[in-house]
């Protein structure tokens, strides 16, 4: 085992996608190959590579489970915004995977979870947009 414990933060990120690919390869008794980038895994999955498709399926399902757990933990009942460098590349996978099922599958809370929207932020610099909006609101002309 490369890591003694795998945190949510270590798993649901670009390097986590690569680590998951390597772990699933080793479990299957297959050689994970040389150095990989997250974009390699997503590109190979889009081309139909079964190992990469499986990696994305597992990644999206775990992502959904973690996002759902965070709603229950924080009470974010109005919605969850998915952000990060991987999100734009994963949109199709997220929509056609177990993401939403795992997000909603929370026992007696499942009906409430089904009403919580999940939205993807795909702008490359959402923080800059937010800062600009804040500047206009704070320092712009008052009407």
Task: Show the residue positions of the predicted features.
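ATP-binding/phosphotransfer module of carbohydrate and carboxylate kinases, centering on a glycine-rich
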Residues: 2-143
């Amino acid at each position: 085992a490369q890591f003694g414990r795998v945190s949510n933060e270590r798993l649901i990120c670009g390097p986590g996608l690569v680590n998951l690919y390597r772990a699933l390869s080793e479990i299957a008794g297959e050689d994970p190959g040389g150095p990989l980038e997250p974009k390699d895994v997503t590109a190979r999955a889009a081309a139909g590579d079964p190992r990469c498709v499986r990696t994305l399926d597992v990644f999206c399902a775990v992502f959904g489970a973690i996002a759902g757990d965070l709603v229950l933990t924080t009470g974010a009942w109005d919605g969850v915004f998915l952000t990060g460098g991987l999100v734009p590349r994963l949109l199709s996978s997220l929509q056609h995977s177990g993401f939403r099922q795992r997000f909603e599958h929370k026992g007696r809370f499942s009906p409430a979870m089904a009403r919580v929207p999940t939205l993807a932020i795909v702008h490359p610099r959402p923080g800059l947009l937010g800062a600009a909006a804040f500047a206009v609101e704070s320092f712009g002309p008052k009407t």
